[in-house]
């Protein structure tokens, strides 16, 4: 097995850490269509901050390319491209389809194509395999084979890394399932779980994030109820958390490449086969509306303080979808920006983690370098970056005018230190 060369297709948050680990042990070619990304990696720079320059150096058998010719000799192809949703919240399989076309054009007899992208159950064999067959002229499970091992990367998490998270694996035949499982065992210290088939592995991945999404939706709904009852949500959760089996979820904006996206893949397939998934979609609607709810609460607090909402200066602290990482994918902080904008507010976004060019390109939001003291009518703590945790209450309030509103989404401050929080 170790003599087989791997092509890693897609070098983002998922693909690069995987390529680095395999690249410590065997020949790996990292392929990506983004030339700027490839140039950075060749210079030892990972803009996602998932791997350090030292880790890149340790992957002595790893090389990078945008040239399709360079991966023709590979016999194992691991595809780690994004699987987003479109503006109608439907699965957008374009990156997966395009990458399948790419791999199919260089596919040879005996090759194995392993997908890591999150999809609905059946997508690998219903969508990807026909493309591979069409592009290559080869027959599935006769000339080439497929595997599936869903990614479990948690961006920004330096404790749970690719090697320390148990890996689910599957293959299109029992023999290939074993081969795929043994491949991942080379690098996964936490061990593997060989699923009975590809559909089972696909379903396992998509429900991991659906379960989390539904749980957060429940807590978000409780936060809405407790707000009307004038009860502090965190105090309730701390009290309930003293029972051993109470799950430690917190309310908030639900974004990112997984939790706010994956449920729509499952519900899409459910509707396709004639089942209307009520609870999952109800949870999605609730979570998707939290940005609007926060702006509504901040606006009411401003009105109570006789602060004009129209033309108000608003400071939003944080733009990434989670703390301590530069990942902007599907961040729901943009909902705050848009909602405040609908009231003709002047919104400044401050986030020391983000790439400003990326923020402008993705959301037409240009983050400021530093907040201006004494400028803002309302301050919203949206992301729990360490840089914000290190600020004192006085330092945060210094950004506001004398009569400003301070709203805390992430419980960075105590209840009696802010005007409102989830």
Language-model features: locations:
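Structural/interface elements that position substrates and couple domains in central-metabolism enzymes
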Residues: 1-422
């Amino acid at each position: 097995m170790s003599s087989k060369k791997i092509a890693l297709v897609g070098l983002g948050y998922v693909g690069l850490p995987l390529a680095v680990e395999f690249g410590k042990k065997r020949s790996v070619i990292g392929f990506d269509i983004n030339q700027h990304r490839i140039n950075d990696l060749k210079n030892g720079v990972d803009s996602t901050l998932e791997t350090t320059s030292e880790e890149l150096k340790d992957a002595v058998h790893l090389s990078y390319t945008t040239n399709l010719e360079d991966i023709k000799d590979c016999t194992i192809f691991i595809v780690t491209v994004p699987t987003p949703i479109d503006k109608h919240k439907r699965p957008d399989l374009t990156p997966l389809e395009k990458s399948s076309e790419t791999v199919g054009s260089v596919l040879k007899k005996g090759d194995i194509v392993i997908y890591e992208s999150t999809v609905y159950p059946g997508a690998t064999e219903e969508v990807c395999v026909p493309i591979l067959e069409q592009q290559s002229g080869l027959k599935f499970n006769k000339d080439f084979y497929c595997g599936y091992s869903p990614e479990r990367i948690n961006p920004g998490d330096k404790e749970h890394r690719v090697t320390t998270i148990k890996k689910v694996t599957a293959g299109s035949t029992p023999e290939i399932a074993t081969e795929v499982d043994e491949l991942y065992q080379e690098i996964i210290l936490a061990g593997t779980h060989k699923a009975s088939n590809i559909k089972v592995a696909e379903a396992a991945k998509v429900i991991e994030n659906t379960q989390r999404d539904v749980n957060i939706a429940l807590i978000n709904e409780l936060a809405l109820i407790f707000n009307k009852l004038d009860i502090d949500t965190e105090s309730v959760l701390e009290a309930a958390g003293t029972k051993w089996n109470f799950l430690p979820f917190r309310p908030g904006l639900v974004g990112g490449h997984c939790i706010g996206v994956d449920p729509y893949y499952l519900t899409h397939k459910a509707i396709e086969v004639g089942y209307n998934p009520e609870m999952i979609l109800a949870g999605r609607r609730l979570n998707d509306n939290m940005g609007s709810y926060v702006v509504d609460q901040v606006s009411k607090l401003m009105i109570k303080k006789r602060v004009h909402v129209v033309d108000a200066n608003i400071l939003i602290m944080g733009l990434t979808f989670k703390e301590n990482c530069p990942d902007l994918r599907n961040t729901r902080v943009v909902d705050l920006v848009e909602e405040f904008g609908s009231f003709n507010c002047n919104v400044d976004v401050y986030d020391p983690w983000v790439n400003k060019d990326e923020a402008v390109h993705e959301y037409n939001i240009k983050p400021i370098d530093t907040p201006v003291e004494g400028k803002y009518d309302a301050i919203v703590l949206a992301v729990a970056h360490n840089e914000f945790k290190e600020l004192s209450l006085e330092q945060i309030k210094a950004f506001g005018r004398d009569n400003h509103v301070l709203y805390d989404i992430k419980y960075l401050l105590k209840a009696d230190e802010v005007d409102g929080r989830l």
